[in-house]
């Protein structure tokens, strides 16, 4: 913890093409070794693939996909009397978005398609249709929270 008061939250600038801070955050999540331009190109090409396949605005599809990925509940470890309990807690809005973006990028990277653009586009499309690995991750997280409901009174 910092000694000089709370750390100021840094705000990202909206991206040039879609004028969205959410897209900028996704670009930053995808970025490897500081290559932001490369990350931007990959995302925009993935959005082009999404709009080709669906005929809809890629931002609409992306927002729907993110909505389907973002968790509402998660479990956090709490130590009580020598035992660790998995306590279900509600996820703050900022963390929900962060987890959604992180899972989207991570599971897109694990897919089998040839290029990252195809992987990302397909993961976005799957998530928008409530399928895919990132949606499964959310379901697993919710199942864990549901299974540990008995420890909800340990919430802090």
From Swiss-Prot:
Protein family membership: Belongs to the universal ribosomal protein uS7 family.
GO molecular function: rRNA binding; structural constituent of ribosome; tRNA binding
Any one Gene Ontology cellular component term annotated for this protein: small ribosomal subunit
GO terms (BP aspect): translation
HAMAP family: Ribosomal_uS7_B
InterPro entries named among the record's database cross-references: Ribosomal_uS7, Ribosomal_uS7_bac/org-type, Ribosomal_uS7_CS, Ribosomal_uS7_dom, Ribosomal_uS7_dom_sf
PANTHER family, A to Z: RIBOSOMAL PROTEIN S7 (PTHR11205)
Function: One of the primary rRNA binding proteins, it binds directly to 16S rRNA where it nucleates assembly of the head domain of the 30S subunit. Is located at the subunit interface close to the decoding center, probably blocks exit of the E-site tRNA.
Keyword annotations of the record: Ribonucleoprotein, Ribosomal protein, RNA-binding, rRNA-binding, tRNA-binding
Subunit description: Part of the 30S ribosomal subunit. Contacts proteins S9 and S11.
Pfam families: Ribosomal_S7
Official protein name in the record: Small ribosomal subunit protein uS7
Entry keyword annotation includes Ribonucleoprotein: yes
């Amino acid at each position: 913890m910092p000694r000089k008061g709370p750390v100021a939250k840094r705000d990202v600038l909206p991206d040039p093409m879609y004028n969205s801070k959410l897209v900028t955050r996704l670009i930053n999540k995808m970025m490897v070794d500081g290559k932001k331009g490369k990350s931007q190109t990959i995302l925009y090409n993935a959005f082009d693939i999404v709009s080709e396949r669906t005929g809809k605005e890629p931002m609409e599809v992306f927002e729907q996909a993110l909505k389907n990925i973002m968790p509402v509940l998660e479990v956090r470890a709490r130590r009580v009397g020598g035992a660790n309990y998995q306590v279900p807690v509600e996820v703050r809005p900022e963390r929900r978005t962060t987890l959604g973006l992180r899972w989207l990028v991570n599971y897109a990277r694990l897919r089998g398609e040839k290029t990252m653009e195809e992987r990302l586009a397909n993961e976005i499309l799957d998530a928008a249709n409530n399928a895919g690995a990132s949606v499964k991750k959310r379901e697993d997280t919710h199942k864990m929270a549901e299974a540990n409901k008995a420890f909800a009174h340990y919430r802090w």
